[in-house]
UniProtKB/Swiss-Prot annotation:
Boundaries of every GIY-YIG domain copy: 52-130
Originating gene: uvrC
GO BP: nucleotide-excision repair; SOS response
Organism lineage: Bacteria, Pseudomonadati, Pseudomonadota, Alphaproteobacteria, Hyphomicrobiales
Protein name: UvrABC system protein C
Highest rank taxon of the organism: Bacteria
Domain UVR: 240-275
Signal as UniProt keyword: no
Length: 661
């Protein structure tokens, strides 16, 4: 790395990322103290030293927070545009005025600059860039290749296992539905390898005709491999040939008076027809493509993405990128694409609803990244145009629903402010709940709601840690949750009047301090929360409301508790009551889900996990040899040493672990 006049000349990708993403607030502040400039004058000073080369620039405010990340074919020319005092739209004018420091990285090519820009925008969340929200990884279906009886699984994350991967699918529910159908059509197992190895009789899935039970050899290895081959062919787009083969097999079985087998083929055919009927539009001439369409209205953009693989429609997903209203739809779409594919596999063909700037550059960047040719196309006619139109209709309709929902939420938030006598309409509402069974596996949960709905990437869960809390003490649990939540907030950002309700790092337009706290509980819970808030000096900064069920615990008879006020109820048909119930129920759902996951993890905890040097391979060997953890615990030292991969030293550790307790 060569650094000269705040310009980094990096030799490799790692150096570029390291330099641009690890500058500290102190570094930026100290550098700005040296030049004593801000805004356009500051930028003019930097322009003097910039080369006529491609690269990435970063604009930083006085607090060291990144305002904007951009790329340029020519850094000197591009950044010079910001030195003019006039002629900019409101967004760029505000950005220039807030700039207190800049950082630069010179790259070898403009393609490198484009890829680096997308990576940094996703990592740094600059508030003046177009930001991709809800960027979850996509689920895949895998058929394993590392076992005599391949299994069918849902998969997310890295492709570390030896298997055939089919996807991406637009949603987890789409994968689950497809797997259910594949089970009915091809009878493949979905159990883990360890479960399969230790079964002595078929499970319930065999009884209901969802599995062929290779675990107990109810089917020969050869016949099972044929089922696996059929499932792979179907997922590869050869559905018609698979159905033709099944029809012939069904007729043959019926001709031989094997009506039970014929009925089985009939049911499998029905399952395949069912999934195809729910796939909507399927292309006839396109094997692999992603289709993007954007719709804009009232400053909000919706991008609809459809995934077509193996000639099949594998679902769609809607995105609402955060972008200033001054961005055009083509600018939003271009930025969205570069961020979207930053960590996702690329299809051969990408279809767009409208032209974007630097389309050729983006195609070259994607081709370089994928190590094969990637085409970006704006179709004018034919099947490709039909697919784009289909995506645009969906984007337009989804945006309409979003706008209606936002308008409804705005009215509801205004109503909440009026009912609870808040000083202003709340922007952020936090709802808390606890979940446990007689004090065991106790967890606290926090969900967050804003005017655009639930902000799920800001949900938080709290494992109750304190040993001083009596099992089942809901008040004590809530105290711990509130104390941990707001102690950390104060530690990181100071008190609300000091932080000026600064914005969340996950969403630059969303505050980190709640205007309203909702608690699932009555007077006791409210008093518990206020006790902690008083200790932290926060008692006067936010309103706390408790929602308690009525005497008969029926929905619609909730009582609301606010400190210093008489408890009250709302009319049973009041839409604000329904909304508050929905907030409460979402917190309850999240808390119960977290508790169940913790309880399940505890239940499935293997005693072998506590022993040093016992990894997955040795654990699998032990379970395969003995059949259960209980049998391992009662095994003799001599028996343990007979297990393949278990040395005398390891066997002694296992024996001591179970016999010294």
């Amino acid at each position: 790395m060569i650094l000269k006049n705040n310009i980094a000349y990096a030799e490799n990708e790692q150096e570029k990322l390291s330099f641009l993403s690890h500058i500290t607030w102190d570094d930026a502040h100290q550098r700005n103290d040296k030049n004593q400039f801000k805004g356009a004058k500051l930028i003019q000073e930097f322009v003097k030293h910039l080369p006529h080369k491609p690269g990435v620039y970063r604009m930083v405010d006085e607090n060291g927070k990144v305002l904007y990340v951009g790329k340029a074919r020519n850094l000197k020319k591009r950044v010079s545009n910001y030195t003019r005092e006039q002629g900019h739209n409101n967004r760029i004018t505000r950005m220039i005025r807030a700039t207190s420091h800049m950082e630069f990285v010179v790259t070898h090519t403009e393609i490198e600059a484009l890829l680096l820009e997308a990576n940094l925008i996703k990592r740094l969340h600059p508030r003046f860039n177009v930001l991709l929200r809800d960027d979850k990884s996509f689920p895949y279906i895998i058929i394993t290749d590392d076992h005599r009886a391949p299994a069918l699984y849902k998969h997310r994350g890295a492709r570390t296992r030896k298997a055939h991967y089919f996807g991406p699918f637009a949603s987890s529910s789409a994968v689950t539905q497809t797997i259910n159908v594949l089970q009915r059509a091809f009878l493949l197992r979905t159990c883990t390898d360890s479960v399969l190895e230790n079964r002595t009789r078929p499970c319930l899935l065999y009884q209901i005709k969802r599995c062929s039970a290779p675990c107990t050899h109810e089917i020969s290895d050869r016949d099972y491999r044929e089922l696996v081959k059929g499932a792979k062919s179907f997922l590869s787009g050869k559905s018609q040939s698979i159905k033709n083969d099944m029809v012939q097999a069904m007729h043959k079985a019926a001709k031989n008076f094997d009506f039970e087998q014929a009925a089985a083929y009939r049911d499998r055919l029905s399952a395949l027809s069912h999934i195809q009927s729910h796939q909507g539009i399927n292309p006839q001439t396109i094997e692999e493509a992603d289709v993007f369409a954007i719709a804009q209205k009232e400053g909000i953009s919706c991008i609809q993405v459809f995934f077509f693989r193996m000639g099949q429609n594998w679902g769609n997903r809607a995105y609402f990128p955060k972008a200033d209203p001054s961005f055009s739809s083509s600018e939003i779409l271009a930025s969205f694409l570069s961020q979207f594919y930053d960590d996702k596999p690329l299809p051969k063909l990408i279809l767009l609803s409208e032209s974007i700037e630097d389309k050729t550059l983006l195609a070259e960047a994607f081709s370089l990244k994928a190590n094969r040719k990637i085409s970006l196309s704006l179709p004018k006619q034919g099947e490709r145009k039909t697919l784009v139109n289909y995506a645009y209709i969906n984007a337009h309709e989804t945006l309409g629903h979003k706008l209606a929902e936002t308008a409804t939420h705005t009215k509801l938030f205004q109503g909440i402010a009026e009912i609870f006598q808040l000083p202003h309409t709340p922007c952020r509402i936090e709802i808390y709940d606890n979940s446990h069974i007689m004090g065991t596996n106790a967890v606290g949960a926090m969900i967050v709601a804003g005017k655009n709905g639930f902000i799920k990437n800001q949900y938080r869960k709290f494992n109750i840690r304190s040993t001083d809390i009596t099992p089942g003490d809901d008040f004590g649990m809530m105290k711990e949750v509130i104390k941990r939540r707001f102690s950390r907030l104060i530690k990181e950002h100071g008190l609300p009047h000091e932080s000026k309700n600064i914005q969340s790092k996950d969403d630059a337009s969303f505050p980190i301090w709640p205007d309203l706290i909702l608690i699932d509980g009555g007077k006791g819970q409210i008093n518990s929360v206020h006790t902690i808030l008083s200790e932290l000096g926060l008692d006067n900064f936010m309103t706390v409301v408790g929602i308690a069920k009525g005497a008969d615990r029926r929905a619609g008879r909730e009582r609301f508790f606010i400190k210093g006020k008489t408890p009250f109820t709302l009319p049973p048909c009041d839409p604000i009551l329904y909304f508050l119930q929905r907030l409460r129920d979402e917190a309850h759902r999240f808390a119960i889900g977290t508790h169940r996951a913790k309880r399940k993890k505890e239940t499935l905890k293997n005693p072998l996990d506590e022993i040093e040097n016992i990894g997955p391979t040795r654990k699998r060997a032990l379970l395969h040899h003995f059949g259960s953890a209980k049998a391992i615990a009662s095994a003799s030292l001599e028996d343990l040493t007979k297990v393949i991969g278990i040395s005398t030293t390891i066997a002694q550790k296992i024996y001591n672990h179970f016999n010294e307790k």
